[in-house]
Design a protein with these regions (language model features):
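Conserved short loop/turn motifs at secondary-structure junctions
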Residues: 254-261, 705
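Short glycine-biased active-site loop of nucleotidyltransferases that positions the nucleotide triphosphate
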Residues: 43-47, 94-95
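Carbohydrate-interacting/catalytic domains
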Residues: 1-43, 51, 55, 60, ...
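Catalytic P-loop NTPase motifs of RecA-like helicase/translocase cores
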Residues: 91, 261-262
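Activation on extended, non-transmembrane soluble regions of large proteins
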Residues: 23, 81, 125-128
Length: 820
């Protein structure tokens, strides 16, 4: 595995579309085509993570026949490409009849052969739901929908079903005896009686938020948890994928949301046993100072940890105080990010995740009742303890398992959470917090105790994802390039030493982990972040511009909306993604506002605010004087050109640091995408396929002259991927030695040596100003060939960095032969 290229498959870009582009993918040097999920998803799915039938390849993508055409097309090139695919073991989409397992379960209830495939609590403490599954699908209360005739019985082919608008639900066999559909539809009481006999209970969606009795993917009711910890469920849900690996069609897997599983370690061991030689990476988001568990039998993560390290390297930490003061003064927001996080987590657990907390509370009540020192605990105090511990956990989850001692990392995280909870909440009994912490480390044996730990470990990833990624990241806007999946906006930049420490650790422990700068889930593309990071280097100029723009745009504000925090986000977004049109900007701001959940939200939209925001953004975009000022600011500070230099530097690190580089579709040239769905727009492969042969043999000056086309980035990627393909050992060395620079601009250089490979790139490029002055590095002994320019350098002390980069903004050299 030397490199991957991520493709988002959909009905707009199917297997055969990828076949048509196979020559392009092969020609610029990628080794693996890395596809979004390929199994049958819900009708109309545009991403594939809502699988409804894992036993067949997605028909909307072309089915198995088209998939095999793609495999054949990838294999027929001189340099064969392999296929890496995304799998979703954590959940499935309900999607009615489209999901045969779900349909059978709804029809037959607990007696269905698929009843235990889904993570359903058939013994719900709510009597009306016991033995049933609650479905929050109604737009109003059940009685009102029933009485207005929205629920009817109909015949669909040979089946009698319940219809609610465009949704259908099966009738249980035992309720069909003597059933006359027309007669029942005319009699509300009779219809009510029939519905009561089903193995599901139809409910108003708002009420269901407090009564659902199944595990979801985060807070999405239509994505139900799958119990892959059961051998039969694992076998049935993985049979097709494992078959594609066995016959050579697929050469690697990305495991989506591994933290949602009951026991990720056991799952990964079972998967590894089935595919002992297959490349495996997990979508695991690591917190600051967290490491991937050694117990995971995988090659690494999908690369969000690399994003955090690289982004931090290009932020000027010395200006944290200035930008923090500006943010506080301009927006009135003064909470540190850690407090914003805790607040958002608590809000999510009190609202959209309340039903999951309630289930844990019920378990804890039962446990406490059997431990005499805690049997007098009230539901309220137990719930408070659970919420406080979950809110204080700094990682997505722990991995404590029955029969195995908790790792030092897990013990440390639980200890930190418990100590923090005790300090923040002296009103919660310290003995109770200590008891729950011991439960979470499995220091108390028992079935209920193990269940509590497992459920808590499945809850906290949802709390983190919804509370932090999908809420706090949209509330705390100090420098939004840091608001990235896997990042910590509270950490303002990383030192060069921290970056080297990370790379050294990866080289030693996870040399084949995936590296990336952009994904289908990133909030902003790597290029948008690279440009936005430059603001950290010009805080005074940025403040002057923001205050000037705010004063001018006050006339566009609608009834005081939006607030300054959202306005500040807008200015950063416009600078980072410019040129951005009104449609894209408004869509981004609307999503940001609803995710922040301050003035509006997805669940409780406020039309007046949404309209005011749309009108404000539209007026700002139509203001010619403002746009001229914005473009003048961007041009005066050379943010486009400098952002491109930073992008080339980051791309070089992506392609040369320890690990396997992944390129997100369209990112082989400049890509100024925002959060989904903006980052899933179609890629113009016709243009890229035409550009590639034009620049393949061009020199540095020629491609730099075509910078607006993205030529420098595509040229750099093509050259380095070619080198990775023809000389994999050059990039596969486990050695990693930091290379120090000396001189006036030393802090602007990042360099390292990996045996025969030497890399030097610029950082903090606004302050560098394109002038390396007297900055030098010591080039190790030997004859070095530039992989960028083809030039030769001889090893020795005091080699000027300016000389290494006089033709192109980065330097990548390979040693021809070791000195005698």
């Amino acid at each position: 595995m030397s490199s991957t290229y991520r493709l988002q498959l959909s009905k707009q870009f199917r297997f055969d579309d990828a076949v048509a582009r196979a020559g392009y993918f092969a020609s610029f040097g990628v080794a693996h085509l890395y596809c979004s999920p390929v199994l049958q998803a819900a009708p109309g799915s545009n991403h594939g993570y809502d699988v409804v039938d894992p036993t067949r390849v997605a028909e909307e993508l072309g089915g198995e026949v088209a998939l095999r055409r793609l495999v054949a097309a990838l294999h027929e090139h001189e340099h064969e490409l392999a296929l890496l695919v995304d799998i979703v073991p954590n959940h499935m989409a309900t999607a009615g009849r489209a999901n045969p397992w779900w349909w059978d379960m709804l029809q037959n209830g607990p007696s269905s052969r698929y009843a235990n495939y889904f993570d359903i609590d058939w013994e719900s403490p709510i009597s009306a739901v016991k033995g049933k599954v609650l479905l929050g699908v109604l737009g109003d209360r059940y009685g009102k929908e029933l009485e207005r005739g929205a629920l009817t019985l109909q015949r669909e082919g040979s089946e009698a079903v319940v219809r609610y608008h465009d949704q259908m639900f099966p009738l249980s066999p035992e309720s069909l005896d003597g059933l006359e559909l027309d007669a029942v539809n005319r009699d509300t009481d009779a219809l009510d009686a029939i519905l009561e006999r089903q193995h599901y209970r139809l409910s108003y969606w708002r009420s269901a938020q407090e009564q659902l009795n199944y595990r979801r993917f985060f807070t999405i009711d239509s994505l139900i948890g799958l119990r892959v910890e059961e051998p039969q469920v694992f076998d049935d849900s993985h049979r097709v994928i494992l078959g594609l690996i066995a016959d050579g069609s697929v050469g690697g897997l990305r495991i989506d949301h591994v933290d949602g599983l009951r026991d990720p370690v056991s799952y990964l061991r079972r998967l590894r046993s089935a595919v002992p030689d297959t490349y495996l990476v997990v979508e695991k988001i690591l917190a600051t100072n967290e490491e991937l568990p050694d117990s995971f039998p995988v090659h690494g993560t999908t690369g969000y940890d690399f994003i955090a390290q690289v982004d931090g390297l290009f932020v000027d930490a010395g200006n944290e105080g200035s930008l923090t003061a500006l943010y506080h003064a301009f927006t009135g927001q003064s909470q540190p990010f850690s407090e914003v996080v805790r607040t958002c987590k608590q809000e999510m657990m009190a609202s959209e995740l309340a039903v999951d907390v309630e289930r844990l509370t019920n378990l804890l009540l039962d446990i406490c009742d059997r431990h005499r020192r805690h049997r007098d605990r009230t539901r309220r105090e137990l719930q408070e303890a659970i919420r406080e511990l979950a809110a204080g956990l700094h990682v997505y989850r722990t991995y404590v398992r029955p029969g195995s001692p908790a790792s030092e990392q897990d013990q440390r995280q639980i200890s930190i959470a418990a100590e923090g909870a005790a300090g923040r909440r002296p009103d919660i009994d310290a003995d109770l917090l200590a008891f729950v912490a011991d439960l979470l480390l499995m220091r108390h044996e028992g079935v209920a105790e193990a269940e509590f730990t497992a459920r808590f470990q499945q809850l906290t990833p949802a709390v983190m994802a919804k509370g932090v990624e999908d809420t706090a990241f949209y509330r705390y806007n100090r420098l939004v390039s840091l608001n990235e999946v896997g990042g910590d906006p509270g950490v303002f930049g990383h030192s060069v030493e921290e970056f080297h420490s990370y790379c050294s650790r990866i080289a030693a422990k996870w040399p084949a982990t995936m590296l990336t700068l952009s994904t289908h889930d990133t909030k902003r593309s790597g290029d948008v972040r690279a440009r936005t990071n430059l603001l950290s280097e010009i805080p005074a100029e940025w403040e002057f511009a923001v205050r000037r723009w705010a004063e001018r745009n006050e006339r566009h504000r609608v009834q005081g909306y939006p607030d300054r925090n959202l306005e500040y986000l807008m200015y950063q977004t416009m600078v980072g993604a410019w040129p951005v049109d009104e449609v894209r900007l408004v869509a981004f701001l609307q999503k940001a506002a609803r995710e922040a959940k301050v003035h509006t939200s997805w669940i409780n939209p406020v039309p007046a605010f949404d309209d005011a925001l749309t009108r404000f953004a539209g007026s700002v975009m139509a203001d010619a004087e403002f746009k001229s000022d914005l473009e003048s600011f961007i041009g005066r500070h050379q943010l486009v050109a400098l952002g491109r230099v930073a992008s080339l530097a980051q791309t070089t690190l992506l392609l040369t640091c320890p690990g396997v580089p992944d390129l997100y579709q369209g990112s082989e040239v400049w890509n100024l995408s925002l959060v989904d769905p903006d980052n899933r727009r179609p890629v113009d492969y016709e243009r890229l396929a035409g550009l590639l042969p034009e620049i393949r043999s061009a020199g540095p000056s020629d491609v730099l002259a075509r910078s607006d086309e993205g030529a420098p980035k595509l040229w750099l990627i093509t050259r380095l991927l070619h080198e990775r393909r023809v000389d994999p050992d050059l990039f596969g060395s486990a050695s990693y030695t930091p290379l120090a620079a000396v001189g006036a601009k030393a802090k602007h250089a990042v360099g390292f040596v990996r045996d025969r490979l030497l890399v030097v790139v610029p950082r903090l490029v606004a302050g560098l100003g394109g002038d390396w002055a007297d900055t030098t590095i010591d080039l190790p002994a030997g004859s070095w060939r530039s992989l960028i320019t083809g030039g030769e350098e001889q090893g020795g002390p005091g080699v000027p960095v300016a000389g290494l980069m006089h033709q192109f903004p980065v330097a990548v050299l390979a040693r021809r032969a070791r000195p005698l």
